[in-house]
Amino acid sequence: MSQDFLYLLSKEQLNKKFISENIYPNKNLNYYLCNDLSLETYIKLCKSGFISTSIILDNNFYLLPEIQFEYAILDFNNLHISKKVKTLIKNSEYKFCINRDFKSVLNQIQNYHKDSWIEENYEKLLINLNNLKNNNSNFKLVSIELYDKNNEKLVSGEIGYMISKTYTS
């Protein structure tokens, strides 16, 4: 992060007009702060294109929403998988799962990243988002998991989210 300052976003600013006029065109700032930890605000940030982690500044907890300057989109309808990769997947010693054990993925991320952005407040927020049912927002938190087939041990994972049919992490 190489910005000189972090702009504090309010819940009220998370609307199409403000974001279209002030955030998207700004190619100098891509990190912001948000002190509203509500599920509604987190989902609004996601739907506006932000990927949020967290930060503690002066003993205060904030979401750290990032609006990336560049994105990548995978078109799975036209995805080519080579024969070598198909064979590797078929004969793999690993099992790929989605949403099998969210809490274990969360713990693995915290253990792997010693200076983790997943501190107590952010962890609670993620757990509450994961428990969210029938929220009418087309938002769903997703844990992606890779297990060793021999011992069922979680080898790798990540947490992202889906809005409608689009996955982001």
Residue ranges of model-derived segments:
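N-acyltransferase acceptor-side catalytic subdomain
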Residues: 1-169
